[in-house]
A protein has these predicted regions:
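Ordered, amphipathic secondary-structure segments that act as subunit-interaction surfaces
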Residues: 72, 76, 83, 92-100
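Helix-start/capping segments and mature chain N-termini
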Residues: 1-74, 80-85, 108-308
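Non-catalytic accessory segments adjacent to catalytic cores
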Residues: 88-90
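Short loop/turn motifs enriched for small/polar and acidic residues
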Residues: 101-105
């Protein structure tokens, strides 16, 4: 696998060569999925490299660790500075993707780890383009409703961005691609729309914007929150409410949001065209506002951008 620009890894407060980043086969996380992680974008802007909403991502990392009773042995400031140090060390001057991960490392195997079970932290960074394909941001993607549902409430905490949670996402995305789609959409256990395999979802009908609520089994994404706030600034109201499957087919526009996906239009669901099958006007408007954060065209959000 070619992780372009990836030369060094930050691991437990040390910078090591990429190829030296290894874990023991009896690490707890390898057996039980006991890891929490983040995905963070770095954008090239007219005033230099900027990390997008770094503080919010690091806070969510610690929230996820708290839910799983997994204390991270570094401060938030130390992890934030390590992310920026790694960008500099790897000389990722055209933008990057950062992946910090905290995980239960080598120790006694068992489902209930002891309080002193070691928690390791690693950070990787590399160049990464569009998540769902080179032309996805402009032309949109074809998606299907998955046969796999999101988990029921009080089963697995969906507000934790945890490694084990993503086995569900792997099933959804793998099924979609095997069937010839770009991505899959999961329903919740009550049959309502939840989210994509690794993305939140917005639907537009008759000028109104809808997105599934937190109670639908979603991870409430930071890009999702960004879009909601950009809508508020533009005088667009986002309604967080349940969405039926058939509402997808009848929508005027649908788009995914996520750190990796950014704002990606959906052109069809289950081979049914959405609108005219092209990127809609509101989706385009929000894309422009989102990417304008990094070009300087969208003003008054400098607090979301942190210099390297």
């Amino acid at each position: 696998m070619n992780y372009k620009g990836g030369k060094f890894i930050w691991h437990n407060n040390q910078i090591i060569d990429w190829g030296e980043a290894k874990v023991h086969v009896l690490s707890h996380a390898l057996h039980y999925g006991s890891s929490v992680f983040e995905g963070i974008r770095v954008y090239k802007t007219p005033s230099g490299l900027k990390v997008f909403r770094l503080g919010d991502h690091i806070q969510r990392l610690y929230n996820s660790a708290k839910i799983y009773r997994m204390p991270i042995p570094f401060t938030k400031k130390e992890i934030s500075e390590a992310c920026k140090e790694l960008i500099r060390k790897n000389e990722l001057n055209n933008g990057a993707y950062i992946r910090p991960i905290a995980f239960r490392g080598y120790g006694e195997i068992g489902l209930a780890p002891k309080d002193d079970h070691p928690v390791d932290v690693s950070i990787a960074a590399w160049e990464w383009g569009t998540y769902l394909g080179a032309e996805a941001l402009e032309n949109g993607v074809d998606v299907c409703v998955s046969s796999w549902q999101r988990v029921a409430p009080n089963t697995i905490p969906t507000q934790a961005k945890a490694g084990g949670n993503y086995l569900s996402s792997t099933l959804i995305s793998t099924e979609a691609k095997r069937l010839g789609f770009d991505e899959g959409i999961a329903l919740s256990t009550d049959g309502m729309v939840s989210e994509g395999a690794g993305e939140n979802l917005f639907l537009i009908k008759d000028g109104s914007i809808y997105t599934p609520p937190a109670s639908s089994g979603i991870l409430t994404g930071i890009t999702r929150d960004t879009v909601i706030k950009l809508c508020e600034k533009a005088g667009l109201i986002v309604k967080e409410q349940s969405i039926t499957r058939e509402s997808l087919y009848l929508a005027d526009e649908i788009f995914f949001t996520g750190t990796a996906a950014e704002i990606t239009p959906i052109k069809s669901v289950d081979r049914i065209l959405i609108g005219n099958g092209k990127k809609g006007a509101i989706t385009a408007q929000l894309q422009n506002k989102f990417f304008g954060l990094f070009s300087g065209d969208t003003k008054n959000h400098d607090h979301w951008l942190e210099s390297i």
